[in-house]
């Protein structure tokens, strides 16, 4: 189970806080010095987690670069920590691909997929492990079972057969978390990301016990822009419920964002309402009539990327409706064309969606809840400390429910039943990339005809995204309570005619 209260997250938080402070406070004269000081502020006098203070500072230095949107430095030549700083010292979006990177000095080169016999082996007479192995890879050595790794095919039958649970399955946590098999190894046995397969969901990042994988952040550039007093509007994903403390209501959260420097705050759930109505209409017009065999949702960018990379023949079945982020951003910019828009959410891969040619002008920055929490700390803002002052009233329970696995399909289904009662509805949904691949394989095989298929890359949906602050079970429970209290349950049918192009 994913753990949120770990030293890895604490270190990431410290880095984000320090980088945010630099964006808010450093001058052109002090910036280089302030950035160079961050690894020393984080790792002071003694190494806590690695063999030396020098290695810990080396890792911290790479984290600082990624937090500023810069790429890792090469290992085979000397490159200064602040190399490239001039290009990233701006008040607008900055991004050097790729989004996800493995920090080599942080990676422990964990053993790859392997079954091994532990000291729990009793050397029993029956040898059920030997009998179960289809390749004859198990023999007896010094009175214990021994697995020949050259013969082993990693089927796991020996482990299942052992009555003492003496055979363990070692697999890299990052590799185990990746549902598209995008984790490989470099020449030194360290993890590497296969860019042709990676869909940037971030599950490898949050699963690595060494914190060796990280995404790039726009926290520095956004702090720079907020400091400059620009008109910047936050659009917040519906998964924000409970992310900043049990006592932080929507009204308090809105106030905290305004104190941080945002001129206004809107719910991305508005765009989800627009999408739910539009996709219900699309389903009724195209899928229910047989014109399309099935329809795939498009709000999760990692799910959409997976379809395009692994199931390219199914691209025409992906919904062409605007994602909630884009629909909300366009609505804001229609009304306030001079404003910059910041998407605040649980998702790492939204950073890539915002870099698409067709989206780049709509969304100026993408910030995760984890990064926003660090920005609050950098400015000593406690969202729970504010008085209740207004709230957020942009959306319905249907749109707000997009945050949980099954919520997208559920909202579309509810709209179909309300506004297209004569149309039969068939819904499928999958959460985690491994499950998403399975459901797409079924669709490709023609076994899901007439279905609206929702896919979420992260277990639990957006509530379990890589940039969240709270365990998915807790946050989903709080969201359910919040939805139950919503007065507006479904978006009006007229939203299908809204112009956001």
Language model regions located:
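Gly-rich Lys/Arg/Thr-decorated short loops/hinges at beta-loop-alpha junctions or inter-strand turns
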Residues: 108-116, 139-144, 185, 203, ...
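Iron-sulfur cluster-binding cysteine motifs and their immediate structural context
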Residues: 126-149, 157-194, 199, 203-218
